Amino acid sequence: MSDEIFSTTLAYTKSPKATKRTSFQDELIRAITARSARQRSSEYSDDFDSDEIVSLGEFSDTSTDESLVRKKMNDFHISDDEEKNSPRLSFLKTKKVNRAISNDALDSSTPGSEGSSPDAQEDVTGDSLPKSQNDDREVGREIITVKPTPRMHPVKRSTSSGETSSGLDADGHFKPSPQPRSMLKKSSHTEEGVRPGVDKEHSISEASAPTPSLPRQNGTELQTEEKIYSENLDLEDSLLQSLTSSSFKESPGGCTSPGSQEKVPIKDHDGEPTEIWDSLLSNENEGSSVLVNCVTPELEQPKDGQVAADDLEEEREKGGFTEDDLTTDPLLSTSPSVITPTEPAEPAKKANEDRNTKNKKTTNNRVSSASGRLMTSEFLKRSGPTKRSPSAATSSHYLGSLKVLDQKQPRKQSLEPDKADHIRAAVYQEWLEKKNVYLHEMHRIKRIESENLRIQNEQKKAAKREEALASFEAWKAMKEKEAKRIAAKKRLEEKNKKKTEEENAMRKGEALQAFEKWKEKKLEYLKEKTRREKEYERAKKQKEEEAVAEKKKDSLTAFEKWSERKEALLKQKEKEKINERRKEELKRAEKKDKDKQAISEYEKWLEKKERQERIERKQKKRHSFLESETHPPWSPPSRTAPSKVF
């Protein structure tokens, strides 16, 4: 675990599908986290001096310790679809990063000057807070997945440290060793003053020199480092966020493409050779992934702690920053000056460099404001006062606004592992800047291609329009001939129609005359017919009246005869009725006599019956008295029942 944390190897072989961040970024963050953890643990100790403050500017670019120590270049594959598939942190990682930033942002950064007041910092923080979240999202979209290819690091003896490097293992493979923190020496300002004018250009042979292997740490140091690393896990995630936001802010150089590796030496921080882009464009047209070899940059330190106002204005003009940018983003004022190429360039190179600086300016302005707001927004979140180390005269050059390495050291430690961390961070930033410039160039090429495609489409549309006009003219001529033919045909049709109309009119006149004649004959025929019908009806009516009169006469004679017969029958019926009445009266009288006789006989029978009933009652009384003296009913022999009189 400790070997992986403090390894000097820049990258291991990892699949980009298995992780969203490269091993290079993980190792860089681990090294920075370990250093900041040690500084935080020793922040409250009383045995440190302001002279022991270690910053990136204290290391000379041309010192004897650094002249023979060269990092081996790493190839970073850039896929063609990196813009479309840019990695984004997951929800859990983003949440953890935001929580860690709120706790450790102030510890990892130092103020730009000792004279800055808390009120000014609060003003800057208040202005930058509303836009921090949106800028974080924009920075997260610009992170690009890189697939590093591991390289074998040969072992070379270091003359600056004076110690022998560890050899290869028995199996022949190189095993990365951690950097001991007690090996580096602190560079003095006198060395920087002696060698300020050393040339900043490095050839590919110098840049690709192997890195010496450093001896491993002892067991106790590894245990303490593991303990500090486990306690500061949140700080690692916060540094990841600040690293991604500040990596766009610096403008280092020193990255070349594989095609231009043998042709062009590496320029200063802002210089870009034209052969790089020629090779990159050829690789992009071939559709293959581009390998960008990043080399060790030169880190420049200002000679004095404070820079004059004229020098600051010149550096701002060279770096492409304006006063408005510096006022809106306070962290740009404390960032190192931008170095411009001193050698004269050709017109083609100048045009290419101008285009690249414009692209860098837009990227730096956008990301620097986001990183500045992130760092200043955490100043208000500190509830209690914390002990601060004095601000250094110089600021770090490798991560822009991330000031993890600008804190005081409690004890004198070796500076060579810290120097390796600085170099690693600078290499990563140079690679990232080159990659961003390359992507901007690809965007420009795509825009040019789209513009060419648009022009071709417009030309095609114009050709189609001309063809359409020509076809329209041909169609128009053909249509005129067709119209003449149709007009002649219409005239012929109208002539024939007029002739047929005249013939029809003549026929119609003849038909009207014939109709008038037929009408007169018809009227005469109808008059004769009506006269005959009237005469026939008159004769018929007369005959009917005569028949009715005869019928009426016959009916009268028949009625008289019927009335006579009716009167005779009525008289006969009256006589019969009188006879019937007499018979009924006789029957009634006979019935009355019979009723009287029956009543008298009934009365006699009733008296006889009553008499007989009285006799029977007397006999019953006599029999009941006799029957009361009879024997009792039978009972079983087992029981004896008393006799009762019923």
Swiss-Prot record:
Any GO BP annotation: mitotic spindle assembly
Primary location: cytoplasm
Residues annotated as signal peptide: none
Localisation: Cytoplasm; Cytoplasm, Cytoskeleton; Cytoplasm, Cytoskeleton, Spindle
Sequence segments annotated as region (Disordered): 75-226, 242-418, 491-511, 531-554, 570-597, 609-646
Biological classification of the source: Eukaryota, Metazoa, Chordata, Craniata, Vertebrata
Coiled coil ranges: 442-596
One Gene Ontology MF term: microtubule binding
Keywords attached to this entry: Acetylation, Cell cycle, Cell division, Coiled coil, Cytoplasm, Cytoskeleton, Microtubule, Mitosis, Phosphoprotein
UniProt feature, compositional bias: Polar residues: 105-119, 157-167, 205-222, 280-291, 330-340, 386-398, 637-646
Gene from which the chain derives: Map9
Sequence ranges of Basic and acidic residues compositional bias: 188-204, 346-357, 405-418
Protein role: Involved in organization of the bipolar mitotic spindle. Required for bipolar spindle assembly, mitosis progression and cytokinesis. May act by stabilizing interphase microtubules.
PANTHER family: MICROTUBULE-ASSOCIATED PROTEIN 9
InterPro entries referenced in this protein's UniProt entry, alphabetically: MAP9
Modified residues (Phosphotyrosine): 12
Subunit field text: Binds to purified microtubules via its C-terminus.
Modified residues (N-acetylserine): 2
Annotated GO CC locations: aster; astral microtubule; axon; microtubule cytoskeleton; mitotic spindle; mitotic spindle midzone
Name of the protein described by the UniProt record: Microtubule-associated protein 9
